[in-house]
């Protein structure tokens, strides 16, 4: 079974499962997905999140995926050894219907922390009505995923507010996302001057601009299939202050096409934003860190070298 089909099965399975919802205190562990022992989910909102959307049931976790997220959290993974001072907020993919929170989340954090980079895994809200990728409905399905973007903005501010406590450099905090999470990377990279919620505490005085951005097989950036015209919701917000960006996609990606990365690449180049694009002939979609004989499986090493060239970690 292909990786994309496998994740689709995970999402459908999770949607069919039911669980008992327990009322807990704000700082208690939420029901649904749980991180590995030794790590704690931190609610990113002190109370109810803004723009709450209805979901069909309680948060449900199955086979490495999670659905019906209404209570967003961040989980911090710190390096055991050498610390570079850099941090990456990770956005798993899942079409804004669910989150591949292990495949494109905890496994990614294991890799990053092994390189001395602090990883902050964001369990952002899904589904994010009206932005739910349930079909290939471009060009109509180009809305900004407001609840998810609110969560991303808030998390970047929280990470900066804890920089001293977590031994981070406030100027080395970036984002990495896959598929829908890759689209969220482009949103937070271009909407950092657009506040989408009312400030709730002192952390919201911090900047939500990423210092660097990494989008792996991002989706819904091109206006149409076989077109490199960029989604105007993103294009209209690109400026010279958009952070340096790393893009990667395969030509045989039949879920989110190569034009998604190409269109964003061209938009960034037009604004003189430093950008690096890696395009491969084969590899499909949703491959994460899975090893293969294909060249694309070496993408983590490319990211590490790129982070060194832009001064985020030691080359």
Predicted regions and their residues:
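N-terminal cap/lid segment of alpha/beta-hydrolase-fold proteins
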Residues: 29-82
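Short beta-strand/loop motif that positions the catalytic acidic residue
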Residues: 247-249
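Conserved alpha/beta-hydrolase "acid-adjacent" motif
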Residues: 254-260
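Short beta-strand element of the alpha/beta-hydrolase
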Residues: 85-93
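Primarily recognizes the serine-hydrolase "nucleophile elbow" in alpha/beta-hydrolase
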Residues: 147-234, 240
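Short amphipathic alpha-helix adjacent to the substrate-entry channel of hydrolases
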Residues: 101-120
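Cap/lid segment of the alpha/beta-hydrolase catalytic domain
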Residues: 95-104, 123-147, 191-192, 197, ...
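C-terminal catalytic histidine-bearing segment of alpha/beta-hydrolase fold enzymes
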Residues: 262-315
């Amino acid at each position: 079974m292909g990786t994309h089909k496998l994740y689709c099965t995970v999402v459908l399975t999770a949607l069919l499962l039911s669980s008992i919802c327990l009322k807990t205190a704000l700082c208690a562990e939420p029901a649904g997905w749980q991180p590995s022992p030794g790590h704690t989910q931190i609610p990113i909102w002190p109370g109810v999140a803004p723009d709450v959307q209805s979901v069909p049931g309680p948060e449900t976790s199955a086979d490495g995926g999670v659905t019906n997220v209404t209570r967003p959290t961040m989980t911090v993974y710190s390096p055991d050894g050498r610390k570079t001072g850099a941090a990456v907020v990770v956005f798993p993919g899942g079409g804004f219907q669910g989150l591949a929170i292990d495949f494109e989340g905890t496994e990614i954090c294991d890799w990053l922390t092994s390189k001395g980079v602090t990883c902050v895994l964001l369990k952002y809200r899904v589904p994010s009505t009206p932005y739910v990728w349930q079909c290939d409905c471009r060009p109509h399905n180009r809305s900004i995923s407001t609840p998810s973007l609110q969560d991303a903005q808030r998390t970047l501010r929280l990470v900066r507010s804890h920089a001293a406590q977590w031994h981070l450099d406030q100027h080395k905090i970036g984002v990495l996302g896959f598929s829908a999470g890759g689209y969220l990377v482009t949103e937070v990279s271009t909407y950092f001057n657009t506040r989408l919620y009312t400030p709730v505490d002192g952390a919201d005085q911090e900047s939500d601009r990423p210092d660097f951005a990494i989008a792996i097989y991002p989706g819904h950036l091109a206006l149409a299939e076989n077109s490199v015209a960029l989604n105007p919701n993103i294009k209209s917000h690109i400026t010279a202050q958009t952070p340096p960006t790393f893009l990667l996609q395969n030509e045989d990606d039949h879920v989110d096409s190569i034009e998604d990365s190409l269109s964003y690449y061209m938009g960034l180049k037009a604004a003189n934003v430093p950008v690096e694009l890696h395009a491969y002939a084969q590899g499909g979609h949703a491959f994460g860190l899975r090893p293969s004989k294909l060249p694309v499986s070496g993408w983590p090493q490319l990211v590490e070298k790129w982070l060194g060239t832009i001064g985020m970690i030691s080359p």
